[in-house]
Amino acid sequence: PKAPVKINQNENPWDLPEAAKRRVVEKVLARPWCRYPDLVPRDLLEALARHSGWRPEGILVGNGSNEAIEALLRVTVGPGTKVVVSEPTFTLYALLTRILGGEMVRVPMGKSAGPPARFLYDVDRVLEARRASEAPVTIVCSPNNPTGTSLEPDDVEQLCRDGDGLVVVDEAYHEFAAATAVPLLERHPNLVVLRTFSKAMSLAGLRVGYLLASPEIVREVEKARLPYNLNFFSQAAAVAALEEKDALAANVHRLVAERERVLARLGDVPGVRAYASDANFFLIECLSADPKAVFAAMLRREVLVRDVTSYPALERCLRVTVGTAAENDAFLHALGTALTEAGMDVASGRA
């Protein structure tokens, strides 16, 4: 479905600055389109090395971080391979593991009633699951999609030290949080960090992601990556986005402020529980009203959120992307009327 207020895919509501887009177009126009892009995008790799503080030979770029995830799992997962994840989490991990013949080892996330309520990683249970299953791969999304939960670097390091199995930290939303696992790469050759340009960097439409790891791991993952996987338009746009880091960082600060404003407002809305988040989205739990009815009622008011009721432990939840102030206000208004339409008395908080 489409709606004027589209807050269902965790996109950045603000585009790359116009001047940066024009620089990209000029650069692309100067190249012959009949030629392949660079097999090794050195300009982008060097820009990413400066941006991340990690060596260029330890960076692999992909057509979105989804491609990097797929290539990584192709060289690490086969029939019967165990992969540990905490759930609920990004569904692509399980999808790719299943396609490759692997087996998921699922560890339920914990939950704190708050206030504010939040989902929590249970690191002890993850460690127990790794040891019991002898899983060679553990994947952690931090901040986690769809719960917004972060895993502290000390906990990541604990996972890395517990055997030589691969620890994969998906940091697609790391710009919205305080923590990153990248400084641990130097000490832990079994650590892999994944990132994307689709969220904070405003390039969802151009599909650019990257993987940070030891050069040895990168060389192995490259064997599963298709050649010429990133067109030169996307390469140029990614470099331009990195050159606009100050403007994009300012947008991140605005989104974080909006996230906290909206979560505070939701604390006064009866019938819903909002979960704290370190990302550019958050979960709301419909305590009395049917969440699917609430979703449909908001869509009738041209506000599109994400129905995540099929996820484990989220049977009554919707996921909401933080948008502009106007979009967020439209969401708050639509939610109030949607709760009423879904059969709930907002004034009393009872069905």
How does the language model describe each region?
Residues A297-R301, S310-A351:
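PLP-dependent enzyme catalytic core of the Aspartate aminotransferase-like
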Residues P1-G64, A71, A351:
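N-terminal small-domain helix-loop-helix segment of the aminotransferase-like
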Residues D15-P17, N190-D268, R273-Y275:
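PLP-dependent aminotransferase class I/II
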Residues L255-V256, E260, L266-R301, L318, ...:
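Conserved PLP-binding catalytic core of the aspartate aminotransferase-like
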Residues R55-I59, P79-K82, E171, P189-N190, ...:
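Short acidic capping loops at alpha-helix termini that bridge into adjacent secondary structure
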Residues V105, G110-E175:
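Active-site phosphate-binding strand-loop segment of PLP-dependent enzymes
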Residues V75-L96:
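Conserved PLP-anchoring active-site segment centered on the Schiff-base-forming lysine
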